Each structure stands twice: as structure tokens, then as C-alpha cells.
A protein has these predicted regions:
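Gly/Ser/Thr/Pro-rich low-complexity, intrinsically disordered segments
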Residues: 1-199
Length: 199
């Protein structure tokens, strides 16, 4: 999924079993300038046992308990803290049983609409950074990008964008949603980019 320092901050589901899970709180800033803990939801994309694809946000109120939602917990770094995720917060939990799934983020396209942009709440925090990503590395940079998407007919699309050659200078997060939509996706999630894109 995704890492924060030396520990996992996402979920991975393999053959119906949660093989990686985190407790759903994280500090508001990777570099300790905001040590407040925020209850998070993370985007997750996967398929059920029949191969039907799904895209949701996953919340983990405590180890061993997790819920899927059709919207994120709308935290904004530096703003009011939202309550812990529950079976009804930030929305009623979705009954989804993925057979294979991975979380990363941010979600860049959901129901055909861009889910991340560069609008700011102040001079340093992005309004759509509900998942409290490192803003300097994820939002304001344009490195190599990797993404996974779902088309309207349920196909899974894997996408990479090189950012280290003259012909391609990577992509900003705000550009990734429209790119994924242009190749037929209705949902899309950013994966780890940079050097990971070369794998």
C-alpha cells in the first residue's frame, strides 16, 4: 500500500484476507510540524471473488476492524479534527468483500469526477488533501506517477507516467485524474510514484 516513515499506512487484501493493516490515525504532517493525529480513510481499489472491481475508502478505527465507504473522511490538515471512523461515519459503511485489493492514494478520480485538485485552504494546505498526504511530495511535485483505475465496464487499468526524460516531465496530482478519465476510467487512485514507477 503506502508507507509513512517505517510503517504501513494502508491495507492489502490477498485472497480475501487482510495481509497488511494500519490503525487509522496519522500525524497531520510527515515532518512533525503538525503533530495532531487525524482519523483517516484511505482509498482502496480491488476486485471481489467474481472479479468485479470496486473503488472505496477504507477506515480502520482499531486493529482488526475496518469499514469501506463511498466517500472519504474529509480531514484538512491544520483545520478542525473529525471524529473517529465508525460503521456510520463518514458515511454508512458499504458491504464489500474484496478478494484482492490495495490502498494508496490519493483517489484522483471518483464516479468520473476529479477527486484531487490544487485549491488551498491557506498558504500551505490543500483543500482536497482529505487523506493527509505529504503535500510537498504528493501534491506540489510532478514526478513519475503510477496509478490504477477502473473503467465503466469494470476493467482494471494500470498507468505509468515517466518523469525523468525530456519527452515526459511527470504529472501533478491534479493532472492525474483527468489523464485517467481520458483513457476511459471512472475511478482512479494514485500509487507510489518516483522510483517505484520503474518496477
Amino acid at each position: 500500500g503506502a508507507i509513512y516513515g517505517n510503517y504501513n499506512i494502508g491495507v492489502i487484501i490477498t485472497e480475501g484476507k487482510m495481509t497488511q493493516q494500519w490503525h487509522g490515525e496519522i500525524e497531520g504532517c510527515y515532518w512533525a510540524s503538525d503533530s495532531q493525529l487525524y482519523q483517516l480513510t484511505r482509498p482502496v481499489i480491488g476486485v471481489d471473488r467474481e472479479g468485479k472491481a470496486g473503488a472505496y475508502w477504507v477506515g480502520v478505527p482499531q486493529q482488526g476492524t475496518f469499514y469501506y465507504y463511498d466517500r472519504p473522511q474529509t480531514n484538512v490538515v491544520g483545520q478542525a479534527k473529525y471524529p473517529a471512523v465508525t460503521a456510520t461515519t463518514p458515511a454508512d459503511a458499504i458491504d464489500w468483500n474484496p478478494y484482492f485489493a490495495i490502498s494508496c492514494g490519493p483517489m484522483v478520480l471518483y464516479d468520473g469526477k476529479a477527486a484531487a485538485d490544487n485549491s488551498m485552504v491557506d498558504d500551505k494546505h490543500y483543500y482536497t488533501n482529505y487523506e493527509c498526504w505529504d503535500e510537498s511530495g504528493v501534491y506540489s511535485a510532478h514526478p513519475d506517477r503510477s496509478a490504477v483505475g477502473i473503467t465503466e465496464d469494470g476493467k482494471i487499468v494500470l498507468f505509468i507516467c515517466d518523469g525523468r526524460i525530456d519527452e515526459s516531465q511527470g504529472a501533478y496530482i491534479k493532472e492525474l485524474g483527468p489523464i485517467m478519465k481520458s483513457i476511459g476510467c471512472v475511478h482512479a487512485m494514485n500509487l507510489d510514484g518516483g522510483g517505484s514507477t520503474g518496477m
